[in-house]
Amino acid sequence: GKDATWADVNTKVKASLEDAKAKGGNVVVLTNTMASPSTDVLIASLTAKYPTTKHVVYDAVSESNALDAFQAVYGVRALANYDFSKADVIVSVGADFLGDWQGGGFDAGYAQGRIPKNGMMSKHIQIESNMSLAGANADVRIPMTVAQQKQALADLYYAVVSGAQPKNTQIAKAAKQLKDAKSKGVVVTGLDDVNAQLVALAINNALQSEAFNPSDA
């Protein structure tokens, strides 16, 4: 291939779409699973203009458990959406939300919360097995195996909901910070386990997290 400008690419794509429309040819839009209502609207608009368009979703790392959990709780098969600019305390359990987790796009909101205001900025605690982009930016990074992460998530739930005291001192501190933050706290998880996903949703509901809005999914 050769170098091309975005204008060249757009012209070529538009011409190809119009040609497919005229001939009744199929058009495929391939994406990963995304928690982006605005992108969904754009794809719906494209499909309306070019009726033979099919939207195919493929994930190199499956998001099916997150989708299943959300559907079980809210009746809609979608991914939860998060606005990290509204969070004072962020606890991530195995979710690289500054990378390509759930299609990415969370970095802008996160960056807003990391700008000091009146001497305060959001607190970010990352629990993970391998270093990630989110982990590299965290205030506190807690290395744990996947099994330990699941236990940590359960401990956070019981601490927030019933006031139980986690045995792990770092998790106990994270739980206290979440409880103190109340609706300004949020928990996300990238664990490939439907029960873990359900627990994360339950914690955010218990906190009445402002950063988590199911209706935006």
For each predicted feature, which ranges?
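Active-site phosphate/pyrophosphate-binding segments
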Residues: 136, 140-217
